[in-house]
Amino acid sequence: MIRIGQGYDVHKLAYDRELIVGGIKIPYEKGLLGHSDADVLLHAITDAIIGAIGAGDIGHFFPDTDMAFKDADSAELLAEIWQKVEADGFRLGNLDATIIAEKPKMAPYVEQMKLRIAELLHADSAQVNVKATTTEKLGFTGREEGIASLAVVLLEK
């Protein structure tokens, strides 16, 4: 059986927050604002995986109204979902993700992100692709107000 899922997430940039994208801390004057650590890439990936198994969305499992998830490490949330997915007999076919940000530039961190995501999903890094783009200064990401991410995942059983 093959299952496909897609995920999308966006978070606002804010001062006095640490910037974590793809499980990697990125030095920058702003970080992403959210109930958890606001890792926009891991949230999109988690949502894509949840979609692939037909189990709703990330908010169903980790609601932002639950204080148990306040400042939660998104890598731990992804690992929790992945444990359920593996228990159901699925494994990663491949994952393709895009980070959309004007600043900071993500390209220097993409390889580290790829390795961290592969580790979290018990996969080979060749099964994971992460890329970054801008919106040519258009929209909220172009105005440097936030960062968005898209992810598509293929699961095999």
Swiss-Prot record:
UniProt: 4-CDP-2-C-methyl-D-erythritol 2-phosphate binding residues: 9-11, 35-36, 57-59, 62-66, 101-107, 133-136, 140, 143
Enzyme class: lyase
Species of the source: Listeria monocytogenes serotype 4a (strain HCC23)
Keywords carried by this UniProt record: Isoprene biosynthesis, Lyase, Metal-binding
Keyword field contains Metal-binding: yes
Gene: ispF
Cofactor binding note from Swiss-Prot or TrEMBL: Binds 1 divalent metal cation per subunit.
HAMAP family associated with the record: IspF
Name used for this protein in its record: 2-C-methyl-D-erythritol 2,4-cyclodiphosphate synthase
Catalytic activity: 4-CDP-2-C-methyl-D-erythritol 2-phosphate = 2-C-methyl-D-erythritol 2,4-cyclic diphosphate + CMP
